[in-house]
Design a protein with these regions (language model features):
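Conserved N-terminal beta1-alpha1 strand-loop-helix module at the mouth
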Residues: 1-88, 93-96, 103-109
């Protein structure tokens, strides 16, 4: 079993995002972890759609999105179009978790 380094980009300095990404990639990061929270499913707010898109445009390593939102299926295609590689959901957050997981797989993403 190998260990992967997956820094959370929620802690990144978004004023210097490209530089942050370069530093983390050159330090050996394997995957960028992107937390999306809607203030409904969980009481906090996390990264927004624009943040995810900006990271995907700059990063050369894999990106994993952790959806802590209600009805995650409605965002799967959007995040896939940005170039994320892995999407995590909470099965109790949507009406049809199996359908959501199938959609992720159909788009060629890991889950």
């Amino acid at each position: 079993m190998s260990i992967k380094l997956c820094p959370s980009m929620m802690c990144a300095d978004f004023r210097n995002l490209e530089r942050e990404i370069e530093l983390l990639e050159s330090a050996g990061a394997d995957i960028f972890h992107l937390d999306v929270m809607d203030g409904q499913y969980v009481p906090n707010f996390g990264m927004g759609v624009q943040d995810i898109k900006a990271i995907c445009q700059c990063a050369t390593i894999k990106k994993e999105v952790h959806l802590m939102i209600e009805n995650p299926v409605q965002y799967i295609e959007l995040f896939a179009s940005f170039g994320v590689d892995i999407i995590y959901i909470h099965p109790e957050a949507g009406y049809h978790p199996i359908t959501t997981l199938q959609k992720i797989k159909e788009l060629g993403l890991e889950t």
